[in-house]
Amino acid sequence: MDMRRYYANPGEQPLDCIKPDGGFTAIFRTIACIGDSLSSGEFESLTEDGQRGYHDLFEYSWGQYIARAAGCKVYNFSRGGMTASEYCDSFAASKDFWNPAYASQAYIVALGVNDLMGQNQPLGTVADICPEDCERNAKTFAGYYGKILQKYRAIEEKSRLFLMSMPRDCNDSAEQDGKKAAHAVLLHELANVFPFTHVIDLYRDAPVYDERFHENFFLSGHLNPAGYRFTAELVMTYIDYIIRNHPEDFTQVGFIGTGFHNVSAKW
């Protein structure tokens, strides 16, 4: 038996060894995915007379592909067009997504496209986050994003947080690519502030979404079913890599939400 696939390996990159079954992602029994259309399995329809429609079909979301592959329960806390500010100001409360009944062992946060590209909101910095009171966070993307992390950590103190950056695309302008790069930097800074937090850095490690990728995995401006499945494999593989490279952060995942812990391991 080759045990190398179960350990951290020198020189291995996060997406070198794809895990279609999720690998160690399966250690989480509950995962909540917070995001926009790409977290919602959104498909774009187009009629003969040019009318476009946008449809969130959650069973096709990468989160539900993860649920089926890894055997986890996955919540879709998402909607097409979502921003961190709308999530905090109205959406989450209107959908009861702050309800402790939905407390999860892991949260995957995939926001930023509509905030930074669509609405041109200021990115902000980690200094926009008030550690003592999330209601005092600055009204920047960083401030709202940090508020989401703070509120879910208040619900489940020991949850593991995964922050997802945006993959590069051949159709991005230099300005858009620059915003994606800055967004990724911010996520790494947030991961240094919040304990048990890691970055799924698709900007750095995922393949560039080139013309061939669009032909295979896109339907107009959104992913097609295979594209969402592909994204699920990226996310699961990345989480598996993180767990193998930081086992001390995940030894007690089984105790999250139980009220128990083991003092001999990181908690």
Where does each model-flagged region fall?
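Serine-esterase "nucleophile elbow" of acetyl-processing enzymes
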Residues: D2-S78, F97, N192, E248
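Structural recognition of the beta-strand scaffold that forms the well-ordered cores
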Residues: A32-G35, S39, K73-S78, Q105-A110, ...
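Solvent-exposed loop/turn segments at secondary-structure junctions
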Residues: S37-S40, R79-S85, V113-G118, P167-N171, ...
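Conserved SGNH/GDSL esterase-like catalytic core that processes O-acyl groups on lipids
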Residues: E44-K139, G143
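A structural motif corresponding to the C-terminal end of an alpha-helix
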Residues: Y65-K73, K147-F162, L186-I200, I242
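Active-site segments of SGNH/GDSL-like serine hydrolases
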Residues: N114, I148-A182
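Aromatic/hydrophobic pocket-lining residues that form the small-molecule binding cavity
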Residues: F141-Y145, H183-A184
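Catalytic His-Asp segment of secreted/periplasmic serine-dependent ester chemistry enzymes
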Residues: M166-W267
